[in-house]
């Protein structure tokens, strides 16, 4: 009997995955053993249609395969069938020929595996529910002072109009916008207001407000206060659309409104206020004219779709819901929410592909009447995306749903989305990823997700087949979910009635609100990362992202509200309109991210470094949300390639990032231009560029980082054709293999600009070098890439490296890139490294690097014999340094080294995120050199364990969950001695580096001395726990 035991088998990185489309899913089986030095010599996999059938498998038996492969082993049996659960088990043989017990049965289940298996139709809510009122016919108006379309004072003006309305109103919708902000009331009741945005361009995004509950037959008074934030064009515009039995009636903003430039007395919003002395408003410009152009409101409600059906009185053996959306959806079946996913189906380029989800709903279906329902919201498909506004992919969110029910007698049936579904509006009045969600609990539709609900007044859906993407594929990455909750720690009241709740941690997600009050009471929740000096929330850095959730109470005891279709980056929540004073239990943070296990535990004797690790982890947690975003708070939240280029190696330490980044690499390849350029962001959106050094190269560096971390050869195989096209693009757009001096450069460096041609050519060489390594790992011809690298290297040295080792630009990043990418002649490496250290010393031992130089800075110093300088930089506490933001109270990584400046002021708000993981790329160095854990071979088949004591660090401990099993280290330096305990999992080996000038000084267990190198005694060990003492 073998001493090996299989633990936690997984398929495509997941234990028991539901809904795989992979034709040859990869199987992994970590192992455990009480005996040291255990390795696998062979394995046998069995696959069957039932757990009981594994002893005589009816699908596949690999037989005994002589191999030590135990991670990502492809299924090699007969073709898999769609919608089928496959059970599997594995046993292994050790090096002595002993066989293990069979692992406990596990399973994976296939999804639909192709377009032919879909019979559902795309459906959308009808036009009345998805189209916003047009402002055409309205005018931009202002107080009559000069020419407001050209220039008006920075001031507030007030406007009123009384209108006579009929008694048969069935709908009332107000569309309104102002340059810059407004508050609007109907008969004294405020129905909407806006706050000043950092870009002062909120007028580009007119609001759409349902005011049916506020209007009535007879005279109604509309009142607007509008403010011009600075000297310049001023105006506001609106249309009130009334639906009556006899048709539509529209009330426009025009010269019939009254206006004043003197702040009116209390009650000016009320119907009986005397405005006879107010002059008529002035038309500044007709809609479509003036400086504002053809601004258009956008309908952003989350509509409700439903369908009832009957099932026979037969025993159900299995039921699955396959669903997706153009937009976002949340499915319900017979009154129960389906699954726990948030923001499904996530973000892709919907023109090319959308991911579908698979849910086990066996326990939810029932004989007789059933109801399948869903909320459908705009999301990334039709809502605001980044700074580019709405409708980046389409205007009408749509749903695709297919419920498949199988019975014990072998029969089955499908219930699909189609023309027989019904649609209506609901309590989610608006839902936008950037602006936030507006929820009116008075509009809740009791029972609409359950059978027996009367939907005869609902509207018929319409088809959406013209908008369908090219491919519908099973979800590759984990779903977005609520991972944890954070209670509020403190409540302050910086202004009367304005409460600020501190969650203690900059996070991403939304909040749960608990509140009691009268029906119609409206509570506003605004989100921010930091506070102003006066204790109010600081929102200028959010730019146009309103980040505001609004809840209107229904007045039925304690009410709970959790937004469904938005997310925010925040630590602080401003609460206004709350009945009474909120307590710390009134608001709870709901932390949201793409689900994946966290894989790295790390602690040292230096509190600042422990906090740095926490900030790195929280930064990744918040920005790994469907795509790797640059920031989760402001109006951007895009999949910037440059950020993940530098952060991917760290990401693969701290979280299981294989599935998430594999999915994103598909997004990146979907965005690749026809001539081979990778885009600045993926999914590609807006008018951003492509072909940029250090950004587009993510198409090369990210697959390589994943391969190093997981040994996933399929990532390389999928990437190499696009990498080849990228290199052809770069070569085509070079002059003598030197790239042009354009792009973003060493973004946000500290007054130390590196020439952009140096950066671009260095990255060109680096991508060619990695392409050669990829080809070698895949058994393909690497010679063309090696030759390309050699030629670029020579051109680089000729153009940029002087005979004394100085590099053009003479900046820290110039030397960092040149040294780390092997572009300096060997004879000049020491001179270049010494020059780098001199530049650091000249800045009083501070760094000056930006996004591209920072991740390579400490590794280069270590590789060139300057680990002491690396530690000196790591421990710095003054600007610019990693310690500076921590001393300023950061709980995530900042976009800038000085997002909060030494005097307490904020950096420029246009580019000042407090949750931006790029500078967290230092984690890779910390985990490899302080924890001492790094891959010696791809996927940690061999582990390099090399803690490097230095600086203030005298002890550290870490555990890394590799695909083979946990790798751990714990070390301490004391009284001139050194103690290391480490463990590595079965079927791996480790090379352990002990700081000792002679192996005889090292006491150890199970280790074999192999060489002395670089002041260390190097030992080889097998699996198990080991102790080394100097």
Swiss-Prot record:
Which residues participate directly in catalysis?
Answer: 636, 895
Q: What is known of its domains?
A: The carbohydrate-binding module-67 (CBM67) binds L-rhamnose, it does not bind L-galactose or L-fucose, demonstrating that stereochemistry of the sugar at C4 and/or C2 are important specificity determinants. Also, removal of calcium through chelation or mutation abrogates L-rhamnose binding, confirming the importance of calcium in the binding of its ligand.
- Which Pfam families does this chain map to? Bac_rhamnosid, Bac_rhamnosid6H, Bac_rhamnosid_C, Bac_rhamnosid_N
- Record note on pH: Optimum pH is 6.
NCBIfam families recorded: rhamnosid_Stmyc
What GO biological process terms are annotated to this protein in UniProt?
carbohydrate metabolic process
EC number(s) per entry: 3.2.1.40
InterPro entries assigned to the protein according to its UniProt record, in alphabetical order: 6-hairpin_glycosidase_sf (IPR008928), 6hp_glycosidase-like_sf (IPR012341), Alpha_rhamnosid (IPR016007), Bac_rhamnosid6H (IPR035396), Bac_rhamnosid_C (IPR035398), Bac_rhamnosid_N (IPR013737), FN3_sf (IPR036116), Galactose-bd-like_sf (IPR008979)
Temperature dependence (free text): Optimum temperature is 50 degrees Celsius.
The protein's job, in short, is:
Alpha-L-rhamnosidase which is able to degrade p-nitrophenyl-alpha-L-rhamnopyranoside (PNP-Rha) in vitro. Releases L-rhamnose from citrus flavonoids such as naringin, rutin and hesperidin, and the arabinogalactan-protein (AGP) gum arabic. AGPs are a family of proteoglycans that are localized on the cell surfaces of higher plants. Cleaves both the alpha-1,6 and the alpha-1,2-linked rhamnosyl residues.
Stated consequence of mutating residue 179 to A? Abrogates L-rhamnose binding
Protein name from the UniProt record? Alpha-L-rhamnosidase
Its ancestry begins with: Bacteria, Bacillati, Actinomycetota, Actinomycetes, Kitasatosporales
Q: Which SUPFAM superfamilies match?
A: Fibronectin type III (SSF49265), Galactose-binding domain-like (SSF49785), Six-hairpin glycosidases (SSF48208)
């Amino acid at each position: 009997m073998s001493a090996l035991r299989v633990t936690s088998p997984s398929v495509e990185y997941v234990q028991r995955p539901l809904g795989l489309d992979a034709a040859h899913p990869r199987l992994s089986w970590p192992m455990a053993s009480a005996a040291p030095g255990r390795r696998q010599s062979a394995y046998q996999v069995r696959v069957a249609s039932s757990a009981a059938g594994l002893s005589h498998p009816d699908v596949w038996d690999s037989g005994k395969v002589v191999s030590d492969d135990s991670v990502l082993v492809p299924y090699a049996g007969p073709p898999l069938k769609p919608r089928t659960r496959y059970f599997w088990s594995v046993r292994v043989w050790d090096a002595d020929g002993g066989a293990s017990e069979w692992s406990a049965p596990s399973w994976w289940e296939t999804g639909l595996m192709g377009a032919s298996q879909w019979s559902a139709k795309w459906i959308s809510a009808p036009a009345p529910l998805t189209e916003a009122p047009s402002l055409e016919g309205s005018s931009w108006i202002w107080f009559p002072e000069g020419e407001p379309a050209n220039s008006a004072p920075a001031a507030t003006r007030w406007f009123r109009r009384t209108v006579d309305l009929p008694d048969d109103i069935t709908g009332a919708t107000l569309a309104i916008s102002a340059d810059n902000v407004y508050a609007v009331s109907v008969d004294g009741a405020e129905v909407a207001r806006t706050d000043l945005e950092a870009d002062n361009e909120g007028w580009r995004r007119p609001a759409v407000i349902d005011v049916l509950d506020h209007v009535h037959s007879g005279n109604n008074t509309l009142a607007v206060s509008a403010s011009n934030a600075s000297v310049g064009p001023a105006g506001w515009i609106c249309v009130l659309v009334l639906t009556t039995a006899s048709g539509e009636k529209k009330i426009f903003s025009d010269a019939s409104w009254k206006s004043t430039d003197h702040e009116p007395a209390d009650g000016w919003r009320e119907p009986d206020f005397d405005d006879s002395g107010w002059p008529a408003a002035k038309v500044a410009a007709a809609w479509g004219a003036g400086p504002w152009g053809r601004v258009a409101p956008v309908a952003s409600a989350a509509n409700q779709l439903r369908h009832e059906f009957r099932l026979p009185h037969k025993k159900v053996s299995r039921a699955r819901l396959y669903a997706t959306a153009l937009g976002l959806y949340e499915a319900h079946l017979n009154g129960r929410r389906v699954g726990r996913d948030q923001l499904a189906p996530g973000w892709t380029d919907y023109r090319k592909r959308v991911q579908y989800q698979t849910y086990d709903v066996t326990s939810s279906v029932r004989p007789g009447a059933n109801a399948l329902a869903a909320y459908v919201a705009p999301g990334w498909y039709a809502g605001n995306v980044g700074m580019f506004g709405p409708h980046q992919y389409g205007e009408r969110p749509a749903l695709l749903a297919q419920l498949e029910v199988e019975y014990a007698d072998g029969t089955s049936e499908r219930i699909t989305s189609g023309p027989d579904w019904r649609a209506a509006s609901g309590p989610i009045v608006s839902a936008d990823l950037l602006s936030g969600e507006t929820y009116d609990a008075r509009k809740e539709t009791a029972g609409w997700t359950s059978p027996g609900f009367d939907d005869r007044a609902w509207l018929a859906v319409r088809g959406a087949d013209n908008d369908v993407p090219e491919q519908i594929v099973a979800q590759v990455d984990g779903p977005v979910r609520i991972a944890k909750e954070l209670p509020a720690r403190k409540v302050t009241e910086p202004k009367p009635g304005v409460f600020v709740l501190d969650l203690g941690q900059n996070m991403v997600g939304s909040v749960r609100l608990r509140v009691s009050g009268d029906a119609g009471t409206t509570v506003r929740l605004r989100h921010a990362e930091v506070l102003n000096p006066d204790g109010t929330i600081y929102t200028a850095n959010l730019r146009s992202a309103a980040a505001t959730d609004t809840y209107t109470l229904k007045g039925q005891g304690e009410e709970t509200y959790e937004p469904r279709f938005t997310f925010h980056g925040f630590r602080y929540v401003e609460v206004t309109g709350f009945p009474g004073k909120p307590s710390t239990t009134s608001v709870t943070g709901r932390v949201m991210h793409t689900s994946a296990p966290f894989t790295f535990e790390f602690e040292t004797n230096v509190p600042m470094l422990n906090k740095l690790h926490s900030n790195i982890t929280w930064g990744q947690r918040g920005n790994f949300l469907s795509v790797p975003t640059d920031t989760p708070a402001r109006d951007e939240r895009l999949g910037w390639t440059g950020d993940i280029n530098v952060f991917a190696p760290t990401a693969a330490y701290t979280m299981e990032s294989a599935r998430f980044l594999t999915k994103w690499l598909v997004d990146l390849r979907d965005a690749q231009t026809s001539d081979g350029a990778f885009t600045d962001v993926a999914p590609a959106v807006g008018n951003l560029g492509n072909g940029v050094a250090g950004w587009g190269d993510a198409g090369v560096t990210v697959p390589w980082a994943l391969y190093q971390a997981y040994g996933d050869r399929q990532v390389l195989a999928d990437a190499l054709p696009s990498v080849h096209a990228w290199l052809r693009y770069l070569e085509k757009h070079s002059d003598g293999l030197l790239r042009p001096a354009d792009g973003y450069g060493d973004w946000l460096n500290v007054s130390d600009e590196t020439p952009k041609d140096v950066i671009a050519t260095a990255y060109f060489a680096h991508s060619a070098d990695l392409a050669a390594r990829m080809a070698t790992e895949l058994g393909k011809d690497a010679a063309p890439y090696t030759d390309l690298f050699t030629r670029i290297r020579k051109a680089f040295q000729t153009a940029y490296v002087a005979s004394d080792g100085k590099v053009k630009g003479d900046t820290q990043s110039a030397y960092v890139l040149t040294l780390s990418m092997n572009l300096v002649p060997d004879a000049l490496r020491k001179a270049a490294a010494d020059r780098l250290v001199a530049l650091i010393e000249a800045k009083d031992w501070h760094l000056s690097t930006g996004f591209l130089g920072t991740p390579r800075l400490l590794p280069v110093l270590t590789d060139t014999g300057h680990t002491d300088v690396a530690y000196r930089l790591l421990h710095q506490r003054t600007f610019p340094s990693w310690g500076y933001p921590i001393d300023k109270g950061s709980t995530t990584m900042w976009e800038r080294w000085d997002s909060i400046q030494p005097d307490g002021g904020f950096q420029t708000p246009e580019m000042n995120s407090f949750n931006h993981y790029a500078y967290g790329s230092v984690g890779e160095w910390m985990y490899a050199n302080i924890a001492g854990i790094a891959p010696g071979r791809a996927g940690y088949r061999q582990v390099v364990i090399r803690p490097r004591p230095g600086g203030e660090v005298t002890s550290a401990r870490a555990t890394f969950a590799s695909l083979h099993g946990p790798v751990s280290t714990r070390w301490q330096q004391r009284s001139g001695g050194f103690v290391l305990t480490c463990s590595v999992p079965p079927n791996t080996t480790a090379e352990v580096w002990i700081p000792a000038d002679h192996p005889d000084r090292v006491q150890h267990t199970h280790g074999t001395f192999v060489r002395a190198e670089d002041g260390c005694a190097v030992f080889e060990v097998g699996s198990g726990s080991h102790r080394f003492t100097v």
